[in-house]
Amino acid sequence: MKIHHDKHHATYVANINKATEGKDEVPVLDLMESAIEAGPAVRNNGGGHYNHAFFWQEMAPPDQAAKTKPSEQLQALIDKSFGSLDEMKAQFEARAAPGALFGSGWVWICVNQAGDELKLVGTPNQDNPLMKGAVEDGIMFPILGLDVWEHA
């Protein structure tokens, strides 16, 4: 994880800073939404930075993670969208299994824009569900993401 954080993520940060140098600051959600249209430097490095920053925030030590339970609202969405927490976990694990996503990328559990349904999606490379055009169902908001690149 140290190499992943100190090398891979640090490179994305340096490269997105270079790609956006001299430009007005924009909120990260706006940057992600327009990343595909902005070109490969913003798409790949902005996505890489966002995805990894998100990934670090969702991590917890195993003993803490084992005690964590979904809120009532989240549990209701899980039940509506997947049937149960165990079924959501099983589908997530299957989608993240080696070979399930062609090439390298990320697997995400997202909430749709209406806030009433969860979806399991995969994105190639450093794309994410906040990018316009990255997933079939339009822009969605990630609540869980997993790096499934070969180095991860």
Regions found by a protein language model. Give the residues of each.
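Feature for soluble, non-membrane regions of globular proteins
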Residues: 1-152
